C-alpha cells in the first residue's frame, strides 16, 4: 500500500499550481513567439492553415520546434489548441513577453510582439480571434478563418503591450493582416 501512496504523491508533485502537467515543459526553458513576415486575408484555411504558415516560416528561419498560430475560432480556442506552458514566452531575440501561460492571458505582456522569425521588426495588425483571456471572440471569425468575404474577425496589434496585443479591432475578413506564432 505504501508504494501506491508514494506514486500518487509523486504524481501530485508533477503538477504545477494551475493543475496542468509540468512535464510538457521538460527540458524546455522558454517558448518563442514571432509575428509572420507576410500578410493574408481572413481565408487561410482555418487554424490548420495558420499553423502551417507558422511552421513554414519557423522552418525557413531555421527555428527548431513546433510552432502554432495564436488563433481562435468560435469552436476552437487557443486555450485548447496551444500548450499552456509554465516557462517564459519570449521573442525570437530572447525579449521576455510573459512569465508563463497565465501571465500571457492576463491582459498585458512585457513587450510588443513585433519581431518575425528572422528577428526583423514588423508592424501592423494581427488576426487572432482571441480575447485577452485566451477564449475565442464569439461574434464572428471569418467563417472559421476560411472566408475573405463574409463578416469580421478579432485582431490584435504588434504595437501593444496591453490587451490590444490580441484584442484591438474587428476588421472585415478581406483585410490583410499578420499572424502570431508560438512555439509548442
Where on the chain are the PLM-derived regions?
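C-terminal motif of bacterial Sec signal peptides marking the signal peptidase cleavage site
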Residues: 11-14
Amino acid at each position: 500500500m505504501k508504494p501506491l501512496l508514494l506514486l500518487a504523491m509523486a504524481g501530485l508533485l508533477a503538477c504545477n499550481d494551475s493543475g496542468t502537467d509540468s512535464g510538457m515543459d521538460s527540458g524546455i526553458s522558454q517558448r518563442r513567439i514571432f509575428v509572420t513576415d507576410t500578410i493574408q486575408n481572413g481565408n487561410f484555411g482555418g487554424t490548420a492553415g495558420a499553423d502551417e504558415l507558422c511552421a513554414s516560416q519557423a522552418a525557413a528561419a531555421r527555428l527548431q520546434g513546433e510552432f502554432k498560430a495564436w488563433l481562435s475560432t468560435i469552436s476552437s480556442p487557443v486555450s485548447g489548441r496551444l500548450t499552456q506552458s509554465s516557462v517564459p514566452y519570449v521573442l525570437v531575440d530572447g525579449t521576455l513577453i510573459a512569465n508563463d501561460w497565465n501571465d500571457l492571458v492576463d491582459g498585458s505582456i512585457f513587450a510588443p510582439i513585433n519581431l518575425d522569425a528572422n528577428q526583423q521588426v514588423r508592424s501592423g495588425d494581427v488576426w487572432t480571434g482571441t480575447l485577452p483571456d485566451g477564449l475565442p471572440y464569439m461574434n464572428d471569425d471569418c467563417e472559421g478563418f476560411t472566408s475573405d468575404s463574409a463578416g469580421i474577425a478579432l485582431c490584435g496589434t504588434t504595437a501593444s503591450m496591453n490587451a490590444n496585443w490580441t484584442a484591438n479591432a474587428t476588421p472585415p475578413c478581406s483585410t490583410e493582416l499578420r499572424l502570431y506564432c508560438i512555439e509548442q
